[in-house]
Design a protein with these regions (language model features):
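Interfacial helix-capping/hinge residues at the ends of transmembrane alpha-helices
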Residues: 2, 81, 114-118, 198, ...
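Transmembrane helical elements of multi-pass membrane transporters/channels
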Residues: 23-27, 31, 35, 53-115, ...
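Alpha-helical transmembrane segments and their helix-entry boundary regions
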Residues: 16-17, 92, 207-211, 237-238
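Helix-terminus/linker motif at the lipid-water interface of multi-pass membrane proteins
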Residues: 4-13, 71-100, 104, 122, ...
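Transmembrane alpha-helical segments of integral membrane proteins
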Residues: 220-228
């Protein structure tokens, strides 16, 4: 749609906006139709209520932190963009090209993490805590399997990928884009672990832990970028990403393994209680 509105209808920036609005609107309507069709197929003895305050509040405990997280991420990106703007058009163009390629990878990791989040919720509700850890390990294997070819591609063939967004005459911009990819790509193994772990935390409704890890990553990235950019130039901004990812990952893993330990303790207590009840019955 973007291509059609811009290339053939010559609508420029407005065409991109209208294409986005139309596509997302159609997706929204289709999603609602599919949901209601599946809900109508469900059989239940109880009549479904149109609105439940307890359910609404439970949804809010997960939704509001997620909304805040996305809002603060956007604010952080604006601050980083303002730092980048101070280095001129070439750096801005190189960053714009590299960040598109970076977002392609992060979006792939996020999609897998969302699947892990749903998997975690289902097994948590069923009381199958050991399967949560199995899902976590499977998620790590999947994102690392995806990371290997992407890291090699971005590090070795980053120049040709950046060519997709600019021509060879944009020398400084090209060099900036390649440098960003070579700095960020090796740390995809790190940020992928964070995103999978965050998916487990969200699926476990541990939104406090999720927000702490996410905001720590964001605050560190922005702060370090601001400090290093004054000393190292634009390289300082790109170097802030891996630092934020690494510390955010450590926090996410800390909260995950603490939760895992508590769940297994809970399970062991339930097993002991069942065994004691069986002995009394005998």
């Amino acid at each position: 749609m973007d291509y059609i509105f811009v290339r053939f209808l010559a609508m420029g920036v407005a065409g991109v906006a209208w294409a986005t609005f139309i596509c997302q609107g159609i997706s929204c309507v289709l999603a609602i139709v599919v949901v209601f069709r599946h809900l109508g197929a469900l059989q239940s003895e109880k009549k479904a209520v149109w609105f439940s305050m307890p359910v609404f509040l439970q949804i809010c405990t997960v939704a509001i932190p997620s909304i805040l997280q996305q809002s603060f991420v956007s604010v952080g990106n604006i601050i980083i963009q303002s730092l980048i703007n101070g280095f001129g058009a070439s750096v801005i163009a190189g960053y714009a090209a590299a960040i598109k390629l970076n977002n392609l990878v992060i979006t792939s990791f996020t999609t897998l993490a969302n699947g892990i989040s749903n998997y975690t919720s289902q097994n948590l509700g069923a009381g199958k805590y050991e399967r949560i850890h199995d899902g976590f390990k499977a998620g790590i294997k999947m994102v690392w399997t995806l990371s290997v070819p992407l890291v090699l591609l971005y590090v070795i063939a980053g120049r040709w990928l950046v060519y997709l967004f600019m021509d060879s005459s944009s020398g400084p911009a090209m060099d900036t884009g390649i440098l960003i990819l070579r700095i960020l790509a090796p740390f995809y193994f790190v940020v992928s672990v964070k995103l999978v772990t965050d998916g487990v935390l969200r699926g476990s409704s541990m939104m406090g832990a999720f927000m702490i890890a996410t905001f720590t990553d964001l605050i560190l990235r922005v702060s370090i970028a601001a400090v290093l950019s004054s000393k190292l130039g634009s390289i300082g901004i790109w170097s802030a990403w891996p630092v934020g990812w690494a510390l955010g990952t450590m926090l996410s893993l800390f909260f995950y393994f603490r939760a895992k330990k508590n769940h297994f303790l809970l399970k062991s207590r339930e097993m002991v209680q069942i065994e004691e009840e069986e002995k009394l019955e005998v």
